[in-house]
Amino acid sequence: MYRLDVPHGLMFHRFHESGTKPRSQGSLTEIEFDSILKYVDINRILSPQEWIYRVKNNRLKTGDLCITFDDGLKGQYDVALQVLDKYDLKAFWFIFSSVFNRGVDKNEIYNIFITSFYPSFDEFFHNFIVKSSIPHELFDNSDYQKFYKLMIRMFPFYSDSDIKFRFIRNYALELVEYEGVMEELMHSA
């Protein structure tokens, strides 16, 4: 449930133009983004300068909002900026800085691969499970059950496959194992 009574940031990542295929899961169109801004009430959205001023001076009010864009993705500029401009809104634009330390975030590549080569996330997940040889009993343990309850509470739009995938990626496989499975799937596509 969306809470109207606390100050917070609305964080966004991926966007695509309406009428085009999303390049990754969770991507929004300009129409959906516009609807979200209207739903939360555009008049409640503060500029980054005003947000920082209120934080520094302990003047942030119940219900104040700011908009943030993470990872410096091109779709944010191409799609979301036109909606911000329409309402003369400003946002925090956070760059993806880990490239300065370790290179490309492969998850961005994997996201594009999944949405480009599979008709659904469930079909991808089935192939992922087969390729990774993860036993289905993994999802019967208490660690997974706790993870599932947390994820479904925080992200009620996630499917069972989404949650299972994230558990495997984050906890069941080492990074090198996860990347190996993804690379194998990409090479066999």
Where are these regions (language model features)?
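N-terminal pre-catalytic segment of deacetylase/amide-hydrolase enzymes
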Residues: 1-65, 85, 95-127
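Membrane-embedded segments
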Residues: 76-80
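Noncatalytic alpha-helical scaffolds and linker/capping helices
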Residues: 70-71
